[in-house]
């Protein structure tokens, strides 16, 4: 079996025990100090023992079945793997003494391999033939091996020529009995000492800038392409002085896109590491089958290190970057293409499934609360995941499904600052202002202030001519700041209207109660909550998922709509809609005519044999669900309807109005196929409530007209 190196999908890995950066990132003074310290600790010559920091690239068996019969064949295969980016670097230490070559674990100093000098058949350098410019090649075969192994090492801190000269001098002394090595080491020691005062020369290719990746390059696969030009519709310059200039918005989008690319690179790098660890484990088992009992198999130490799984901290880091990528996909979904955000989310959940299974289940992922998901990210996942992905998402728990705006204030979730393998540091201003960090935070002080402070806030709003009511908790509109990205388009000059699809009952003074089929004017079209104004002049916030489009003519003749339930106070001082085609006197005359016609019809009804008017009411269910129901009543209603525990758990956190506002497709996305039954039961319950409401309204209307008729009769 051949032993190929693993793929480094991200050309830049941390200088940890597994993987190392192939590019050169900008270094801080602290990083420079640490690298010099590491250089001096890793590359030392003491007496007749020298030690070098190297990266193991690959080990091949020289075998015809693997198409490797010579060193040149092995080099050719390594070049081929490098061109396809299928080489995985493994950091270790190479020690040379007068008896053997030893490979040590860079962290534990544990011996991985020990090649006695008589088993080293060949030492050679491979320079500038692949992306690793300074490579050392060793051909080793012990007495029990039928075929030799070819090992490749990248000498990233001390040139391969120096290491090669050291090994050759040790081999010459061993074979010929000469004492060449002390003189060789003396020269090398002087060169290494000189290097300790300067930064080692950069090795490997420079990192490819994310924004310049070509669509056909290997690094560009599943990556975010160029953003949508800001000149396209939807990105016109906004007229408000508070909106971001185009240049600032474009710069912010570019930074967020780069953060997203770094996160995707690190996730892909981690998945490649898992896959190559599995391959190494398989090769290790195959080699162990042919070894003698009690003796290590050839290359067993290196393969054991490669097969070592990541630590729990590294799994957590990958889960955090996955959540960060989900947040950024939702935020940039209108700005990225080739591939789109909707396509990338599926590429993200495939590796996520693999990682969850590798770490033994969702327990580690469930513990990852930082970063939380934004409201847009949760909505984005609900709208794009397929059933299998939805099940995986639900298994990860509240820290993945509950948005930041609904998360408890205590314990506080810290700001998430990712550390990328490439060494690039994301801008702090972008992270600090991100929705998944600030959503809902503006409403916290109002809840925590004293009654006196709360009263002063209300008074200041009352006396301010431009003040507007604060929206509910997660309905806060974006903060008016030149550096705040707004997720909604500016309101056009022409008035905009929407039609209410479902009844909604306000839960506080900031929300607006609306009825189905009512047409209202849009004051603010935010992300989740829209500020609307009713015909009576009342303004408040309404969830956007119960709104539908309304034509201007629908709002132009509001008093002629047959299905309209809410008319507002019919007073002579009632403010007319601007689009009403007539003056106030004509309207009042028309209303008098309508009233007279109604009185005549009611008089005719009274002349007929009297009927006992009674509204039939259905028997109430054992667990009623109304528009005033809280989460506990919703949970009780779901349990009474014998829904599964998963459905009760997912929907039991909603209030009655929130549950009634969900349509069939939204319920199917959250509940799967059982969502159809939930929708059916909600439809029945909604009809029952409407029947109750319409009955009481009709009784009240009839009583009102009856009183009016009596007064008219008395006046005449």
UniProtKB/Swiss-Prot annotation:
GO terms for biological process: positive regulation of ruffle assembly; regulation of Rho protein signal transduction; Rho protein signal transduction; sensory perception of sound. Belongs to the EPS8 family. Residues 199-208 have a biased composition (Pro residues). Residues 493-552 form the SH3 domain. SUPFAM superfamilies: PH domain-like (SSF50729), SH3-domain (SSF50044). GO terms for cellular component: cytoplasm; ruffle membrane; stereocilium bundle; stereocilium tip; vesicle. Gene3D superfamilies: Pleckstrin-homology domain (PH domain)/Phosphotyrosine-binding domain (PTB), SH3 Domains, Transcription Factor, Ets-1. InterPro entries: EPS8-like, EPS8_2nd, EPS8_PTB, Eps8_SH3, PH-like_dom_sf, PTB, PTB/PI_dom, SAM/pointed_sf. Residues 234-243 have a biased composition (Basic and acidic residues). Interacts with ABI1. Part of a complex that contains SOS1, ABI1 and EPS8L2. Associates with F-actin. SMART domains: PTB (SM00462), SH3 (SM00326). Pfam families: EPS8_2nd, PTB, SAM_3, SH3_1. GO terms for molecular function: actin binding. Residues 1-25, 182-243, 449-488 are annotated as: Disordered. Stimulates guanine exchange activity of SOS1. May play a role in membrane ruffling and remodeling of the actin cytoskeleton. In the cochlea, is required for stereocilia maintenance in adult hair cells. Keywords: Cell projection, Cytoplasm, Phosphoprotein, SH3 domain. It comes from Pongo abelii (Sumatran orangutan). CDD domains: PTB_EPS8, SAM_EPS8-like, SH3_Eps8. The modification Phosphothreonine is found at residues 304, 470. This is Epidermal growth factor receptor kinase substrate 8-like protein 2. Residues 46-202 form the PID domain.
């Amino acid at each position: 079996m051949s032993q190929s190196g693993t793929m480094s999908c991200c050309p830049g890995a941390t200088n940890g025990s597994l993987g190392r950066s192939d590019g050169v990132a900008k270094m801080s003074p602290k990083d420079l100090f640490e690298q010099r310290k590491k250089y001096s600790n890793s590359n030392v010559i003491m007496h007749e023992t020298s030690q070098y920091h190297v990266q193991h690239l690959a080990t091949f068996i020289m075998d015809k079945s693997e198409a490797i019969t010579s060193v040149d064949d092995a080099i050719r295969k390594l070049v081929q793997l490098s061109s396809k980016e299928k080489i995985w670097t493994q950091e270790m230490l190479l020690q040379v003494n007068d008896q053997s070559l030893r490979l040590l674990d860079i962290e534990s100093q544990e011996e991985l391999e020990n090649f006695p000098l008589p088993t080293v058949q060949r030492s050679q350098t491979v320079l500038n033939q692949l992306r690793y410019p300074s490579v050392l090649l060793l051909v080793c075969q012990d007495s029990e091996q039928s075929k030799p192994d070819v090992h490749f090492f990248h000498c990233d801190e001390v040139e391969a020529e120096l290491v090669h000269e050291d090994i050759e001098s040790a081999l010459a002394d061993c074979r010929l009995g000469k004492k060449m090595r002390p003189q060789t080491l003396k020269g090398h020691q002087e060169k290494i000492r000189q290097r300790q005062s300067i930064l080692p020369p950069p090795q490997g290719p420079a990192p490819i800038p994310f924004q310049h990746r070509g669509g056909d390059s290997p690094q560009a696969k599943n990556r975010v392409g160029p953003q949508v030009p800001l000149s396209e519709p939807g990105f016109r310059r906004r007229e408000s002085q508070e909106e971001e200039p185009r240049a600032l918005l474009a710069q912010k989008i570019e930074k967020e896109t780069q953060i997203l690319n770094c996160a995707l690179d690190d996730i892909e790098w981690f998945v490649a590491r898992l896959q190559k660890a599995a391959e190494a484990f398989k090769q290790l088992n195959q080699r162990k089958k042919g070894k003698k009992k009690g003796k290590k198999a050839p290359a067993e130490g290196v393969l054991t290190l490669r097969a070592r799984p990541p630590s729990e901290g590294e799994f957590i880091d990958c889960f955090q970057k996955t959540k960060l990528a989900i947040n950024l996909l939702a935020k940039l979904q209108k700005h990225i293409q080739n591939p789109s955000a909707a396509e990338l989310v599926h590429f993200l959940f495939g590796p996520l499934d693999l990682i969850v299974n590798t770490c033994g289940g969702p327990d580690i992922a469930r513990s990852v609360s930082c970063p939380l998901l934004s409201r847009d990210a949760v909505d984005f996942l609900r709208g794009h995941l397929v059933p299998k992905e939805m099940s995986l998402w639900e298994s990860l728990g509240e820290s993945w499904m509950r948005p930041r705006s609904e998360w408890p204030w205590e314990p506080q979730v810290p700001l998430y600052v990712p550390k990328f393998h490439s060494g690039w540091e994301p801008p702090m201003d972008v992270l600090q202002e991100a929705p998944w960090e600030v959503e809902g935070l503006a409403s916290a002080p109002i809840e925590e202030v004293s009654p006196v402070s709360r009263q002063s806030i209300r008074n200041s709003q009352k006396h301010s001519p431009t003040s507007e009511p604060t929206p509910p908790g997660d309905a806060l509109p974006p903060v008016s700041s030149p550096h705040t990205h707004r997720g909604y388009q500016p309101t056009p000059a022409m008035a905009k209207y929407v039609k209410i699809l479902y009844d909604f009952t306000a839960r506080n003074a900031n929300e607006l109660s609306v009825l189905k089929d009512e047409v209202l004017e849009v004051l603010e079209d935010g992300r989740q909550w829209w500020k609307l104004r009713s015909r009576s002049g009342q303004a408040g916030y309404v969830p956007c998922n119960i709104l539908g489009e309304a034509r201007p003519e629908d709002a132009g003749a509001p008093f002629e709509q047959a299905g309209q339930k809410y008319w507002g106070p019919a007073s002579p001082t009632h403010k007319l809609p601007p689009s009403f085609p007539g003056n106030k006197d004509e309207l009042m005359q028309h209303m008098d005519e309508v009233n007279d016609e109604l009185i005549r019809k009611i008089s005719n009804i009274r002349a007929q044999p009297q009927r006992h008017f009674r509204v039939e009411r259905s028997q109430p269910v054992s667990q009623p669900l109304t528009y005033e129901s809280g989460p506990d009543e919703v949970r009780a209603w779901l349990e009474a309807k014998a829904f599964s525990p998963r459905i009760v758990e997912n929907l039991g956190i909603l209030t009655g109005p929130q549950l009634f506002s969900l349509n069939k497709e939204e319920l199917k996305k959250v509940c799967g196929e059982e969502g159809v039954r939930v929708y059916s039961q909600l439809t029945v319950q909604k009809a029952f409530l409407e029947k109750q409401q319409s009955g009481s309204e009709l009784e009240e209307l009839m009583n009102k007209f009856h009183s009016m008729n009596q007064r008219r009769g008395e006046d005449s």
